């Protein structure tokens, strides 16, 4: 029983890990724009979390890197990322054990907070 659950869990993770970041990026932007936020704000949060800049993010999008490679090659995960807490996709981000999945959910969470109208300073854990 547990072997089957572990296999299902692993397969679900692998599907997300190998998903192209370029295929999800426009969805992040659409989610934000539907709620009156901008592409620039989405990018600001991606830069804040990962250390990418305009040029390196464009390279990631052009190359079609998957999420695993996107985070493996990220210049520097922001140390304040550990302050991101809450539920996203049914999971508490601070309790996710897999480091890569946690990083992906950090990104999902801050984009969700942006779409919900939270101030950038609060999303970036500056206050």
Question: What name fits each language-model region?
Answer:
Residues 4-10:
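Short, positively charged and aromatic/hydrophobic N-terminal segments
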């Amino acid at each position: 029983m547990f072997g089957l659950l572990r296999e299902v869990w692993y397969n679900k993770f692998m599907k997300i890990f190998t998903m192209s970041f370029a295929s999800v990026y426009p969805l992040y932007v659409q989610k934000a724009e539907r709620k009156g936020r901008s592409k620039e704000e989405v990018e600001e949060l991606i830069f804040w979390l990962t250390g990418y800049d305009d040029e390196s993010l464009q390279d990631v999008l052009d190359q079609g890197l998957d999420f695993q490679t996107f985070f493996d090659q990220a210049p520097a995960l922001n140390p304040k990322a550990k302050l991101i807490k809450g539920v996203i996709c049914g999971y508490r981000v601070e309790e996710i054990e897999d480091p890569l999945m946690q990083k992906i959910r950090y990104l999902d969470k801050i984009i969700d907070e942006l779409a919900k109208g939270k101030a950038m300073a609060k999303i970036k854990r500056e206050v």
